[in-house]
Amino acid sequence: MAEKTHRTMDDFAQACGVSRPTLSKYFDDPASVKPATRARIEAALRSSDYQPNLFARNLNRKRTRNIGIVVPTITDPFYAEMVSRIEFRCRDEGYWPIVISSHGSPKLEAESVRTLLSLKVAGAIIAPLGLASDRGVFDKLGQDIPIVYFDTYIEGDTPFVGNDNRQSVSTIVDYLCRSGEPPVYLDIPHVNHNSGERQESYIVAMETAGFKPVVIEGTRDYTWDFERIGYEQTEKMLQAGALPGRTILCANDRLAFGVMAAAFSRGLKVGRRPDCDLRVAAHDDHPLSRYTCPALTTMAQDFTAMAGRSVEILLALLDEADPPKQGLARTVKLGATLVMRQSA
């Protein structure tokens, strides 16, 4: 038997024998209507091709059941992993995520924020570009909807969930100093606060351990092309015979990928065994780090906790029936775990 066709919600409500507000209430939360009414609507759905336009319905509300997620890039598996975890958590709580990438561009990031406002999202979880972000755009967003930053932040009082760089960097510096030659530090462009915090934490950790910190300055150009920077910087040092140490601690895993590729191209053996030429370690536990050759020793950020706490804080801010208490955490810094693999 052919399915019945209903073009509008009014048509379908009439076919179900319920009012339009009751039908709308069902689509918001099936458990909110009487069991008999729910059964009638669901029976009608099975015999009809009707699909509610949830997007249009949401736009007619002051606040939707959509959560905006903005990240610098979706091609980086670190952010892809975070988006995936945040997405599933939002779905579990009855919200639909809308994911937008700023592609490393401050202009596109500002455009992404304006798009979220036009879509009337209930709130947003954002990994901003950081130092290049337009603070005014985010201040405007924060006045209109609740937002939470993760991984990095823009100065202000917006809640933030991220890594405790002091703890994580000191942990891996301690390990490298105990297991071999103290590390030199390969820096990245300071695109956000993580870059500066990690460099500063390295210096403090080395001085605390009684060693002289050695920072290899990278390019000061604004770029997120970290693999290329790692490769070119290492190639340049190897070509000049100016590598300042045999243990390199990279500011993040993507930088280390470039370092290891440059070492391989020069015939150098990376690893922690006595016959190896170079040890390489890094930070983040990027999803591909376990698959490099050799597998990369790194500090693993807590993806699950970062995603979970970000959503929890946003939901608390969205809870009109039970507004968040004054004690709601504004800054959550999560510890990282040392993952010892074969590279160092």
What are the residue ranges of the model-derived segments?
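N-terminal helix-turn-helix DNA-binding module of bacterial transcription factors
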Residues: 1-65
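Short, well-structured alpha-helical segments in soluble
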Residues: 107-120, 228-244
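Flexible loop/turn connectors
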Residues: 179, 240-247, 253-344
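Short, Asp-centered acidic motifs that coordinate Mg2+ and/or phosphate
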Residues: 122-125, 247
